[in-house]
Curated annotation (Swiss-Prot):
Pfam families: HIGH_NTase1 (PF05636). One of its GO terms (biological process) is tRNA modification. Belongs to the TmcAL family. Keywords: ATP-binding, Cytoplasm, Ligase, Nucleotide-binding, RNA-binding, tRNA processing, tRNA-binding. InterPro entries: Rossmann-like_a/b/a_fold, tRNA(Met)_cyd_acetate_ligase. Catalyzes the formation of N(4)-acetylcytidine (ac(4)C) at the wobble position of elongator tRNA(Met), using acetate and ATP as substrates. First activates an acetate ion to form acetyladenylate (Ac-AMP) and then transfers the acetyl group to tRNA to form ac(4)C34. The gene is tmcAL. It is an enzyme of class 6 (ligase). Its EC number is 6.3.4.-. The keyword RNA-binding applies. It is found in: Cytoplasm. ATP binds at residues 7-20, 102, 165, 190-191. This is tRNA(Met) cytidine acetate ligase.
Length: 415
């Protein structure tokens, strides 16, 4: 029995994801596929276009056997913590043989060599890094220069570490090395569209372009453009959600509530929230007082140091009330500590029986039972998860689906 692990967002599931899933199964020879998937908020600090249960259906319909949720504390974090949390889940459930990720570079040996340098930090690399930092370079620029010097320019470091999926892939490899995992890493070269391309140009287009198309087309029923770039099952599930009024959900939907919260605060109060430092509270306050849209709010806060993605994560943290104190408490743990099941099929049911025997972390099949037995830190982590969904559903078009507590009432998806 060979088990493949995939780390995904599926926002939404499209033909590129299908290619990745099928090719990953092919090159690994896997019999089963386990996905670790972000919940209702994703790594860029944005809401997913449809909820995690709908996206679980998309994954299972396309060939995944078991979907496990990546906790919010990892899902909406930097690439390093996102990757580390997801890898730990796949490692700790005790049954995964392979991890396969997409990358622009396509050569896992080169990416793993870079990961090895960054994890082991050989003395000469550290010396190069210190030299560049002393010369006034930012940490990312200093790291790039140190890697170039250490590898004697034998590989194209700038090209590799400037590509988003290469960066994430290196973080997966670093995480595997740090925990000395026996999971074998594989990569597939991404095809066609760039991760951040905003226009649909063919049968394989980026998730960003699909979300942009949905936001501007106002489609509420079957759509030929989406049918070209997404599997039919995904399109059907997407429009089932839209027709019910459970989406689409966009970051702009949060503009009124986020701005209202900030406008009621002083800069001193804003400073208490996670990752707010170095006077950023003043920029946040000023931006909230003047911005007329969510995009304007984000752009007004951004600096060279604070990227758009980082600012969006900070704003979502403010929305959810994540303080610096919370961050200190939650960061004491270097793993998610549990595996919450979102959905499975008949093959996934077989996997669950194996996980119950081999997992070093508890399986969560019923949240209401699990949360009663948690220590205070883990309970706080789950409370944030519950709150995130309670806030997410407030953006549904249909008021009938906006009730709080859906983390407790929504059933596991079984297909």
């Amino acid at each position: 029995m060979k088990v493949l692990g995939l780390i995904v967002e599926y926002n939404p599931f499209h033909n590129g994801h299908l290619y990745h899933l099928e090719e990953s199964k092919k090159i690994s020879g896997a019999d089963f596929v386990v996905c670790v998937m972000s919940g209702n908020f994703i790594q860029r600090g944005e809401p997913a276009i449809v909820n995690k249960w709908a996206r679980t259906k998309m994954a299972l319909s396309a060939g995944a056997d078991l979907v496990i949720e990546l906790p919010l504390s990892c899902a909406m974090a930097s690439a390093e913590y996102f990757a580390s949390g997801a890898v730990r889940i796949l490692n700790d459930i005790g049954i995964v043989d392979y991890i396969c990720f997409g990358s622009e570079h396509g050569d896992v040996k080169t990416l793993d060599y870079i990961a090895q340098i960054l994890v082991e930090e050989p003395e000469s690399y550290k010396s190069f890094l210190k030299e560049e930092l002393d010369n006034g370079l930012s940490y990312p620029a200093a790291r790039e220069s140190a890697l170039k010097k250490y590898t004697a320019h034998s590989i194209n470091i700038p090209q590799i570490i400037s590509s988003s999926n290469n960066i994430l892939g290196i973080e997966y490899l670093k995480a595997l090395r740090r925990i000395k995992s026996s999971i074998i890493p594989l990569t597939i070269k991404r095809i066609n569209n760039d991760y951040n391309t905003e226009n649909i140009t063919g049968s394989i287009s980026s998730a960003s372009s699909i979300r942009k198309y949905i936001s501007t087309s106002n489609s509420t029923s079957f759509d030929d453009v989406l049918a070209m770039t997404m599997p039919k099952t995904s399109v059907d599930i997407l429009f089932e959600e839209f027709s019910a009024g459970r989406g689409p959900v966009f970051k702009e939907d949060f503009y009124p509530v986020v701005t209202s919260l900030i406008r009621k605060m002083t800069p001193e109060q804003i400073r208490n929230f996670a990752y707010v430092s170095e006077g950023l509270e003043n920029r946040i306050k000023s931006a909230a007082d003047t911005a007329g849209t969510y995009e304007e709010l984000v752009e007004s806060i951004c600096t060279r140091r604070y990227t758009k993605t980082r600012v969006q994560r900070i704003l979502m943290g403010i929305l959810m009330g994540v303080t610096s104190k919370d961050l200190d408490m939650l960061s004491r743990f270097d793993s998610p500590q549990y595996a919450r099941i979102l959905g499975f099929n008949s093959k996934g049911k077989q996997l669950l029986s194996q996980i119950k025997k081999k997992s070093s972390i508890p399986l969560v099949l019923k949240l209401s039972d699990f949360i009663k037995s948690c220590d205070p830190v883990l309970k706080r982590k789950l409370e944030l998860e519950i709150l995130a969904t309670d806030l997410y559903v407030m953006c549904y078009k249909n008021p009938a689906f906006r009730k709080a507590g859906q983390e407790f009432t929504q059933n596991i998806i079984i297909m």
